[in-house]
Amino acid sequence: MKAYLDLMRHVLDNGTDKSDRTGTGTRSVFGYQMRFDLGKGFPLLTTKKLHLRSIIHELLWFLKGDTNIKYLKDNNVSIWDEWADENGDLGPVYGYQWRNWPAPDGRHIDQIANVVEQIKKNPDSRRLIVSAWNPALVDEMALPPCHALFQFYVADGKLSCQLYQRSADIFLGVPFNIASYALLTMMMAQVCGLEAGEFVHTFGDAHLYRNHFEQAALQLEREPRALPVMKINPEVKDLFSFKFEDFELEGYDPHPHIKAAVSV
């Protein structure tokens, strides 16, 4: 995961200090890209321990089209707690836009199901896109989509995915985003009869919060270790049938966890 450490170092050395919505302050750059070959291991950060359980359950929650944190809470995942209302609702966030995008004529569009079908039927299409950024509903969301749009690409029997992330919390959020979209790419590849290719991560505003500088410096002192391998149950051929038990991580040997505050 040298690419991730390179991003962190680049922002610390070359970023612009800015104020932000949360009042914490950031150092940021605009426009940056990382690439991960999914054939060379699962890109789960090794320079600090990550909570894989949260990453998997959040992705399954997105794919269910769910926007209430009850499923997450039932599975001991708390990453969305700060943004939910008293009933656990978040408004029309990721899952709603992925699976139930509202059309002007009253229909609801299942973008995920549509893109799976298109990958199978027309893999050379340049329209293999899912968007979570819905301008008509952004103000109703507890948190507007940070990872806003992703596109798939098929070549030589391999499925690759590129994510555009408008806003990226490098220390806390980005490691989760890398693992989540890498896993989604692997799942999509399996159900479409393809191998997983690359995950390409493209950023708009990539930033380190000022209260994460010390933690970032500590992480940069650590040497990356070999990437783990993600095993996925080969019997699952329907994207919406995956369960937590269908995933097994092998060979994960990270450095210790580094605690940092979330800016809300």
UniProtKB/Swiss-Prot annotation:
Gene Ontology MF annotations: thymidylate synthase activity
Any one cellular-component term (Gene Ontology): cytosol
EC class: transferase
Enzyme Commission number(s) of this protein: 2.1.1.45
Catalytic residue list: C146
Annotated InterPro entries: Thymidate_synth/dCMP_Mease, Thymidate_synth/dCMP_Mease_dom, Thymidate_synth/dCMP_Mease_sf, Thymidylate_synthase, Thymidylate_synthase_AS
Its biological purpose: Catalyzes the reductive methylation of 2'-deoxyuridine-5'-monophosphate (dUMP) to 2'-deoxythymidine-5'-monophosphate (dTMP) while utilizing 5,10-methylenetetrahydrofolate (mTHF) as the methyl donor and reductant in the reaction, yielding dihydrofolate (DHF) as a by-product. This enzymatic reaction provides an intracellular de novo source of dTMP, an essential precursor for DNA biosynthesis.
HAMAP family in UniProt: Thymidy_synth_bact
NCBIfam families reported for this sequence: PRK01827.1-3, PRK01827.1-5, thym_sym
Identification of the protein by name: Thymidylate synthase
Originating organism: Neisseria meningitidis serogroup C / serotype 2a (strain ATCC 700532 / DSM 15464 / FAM18)
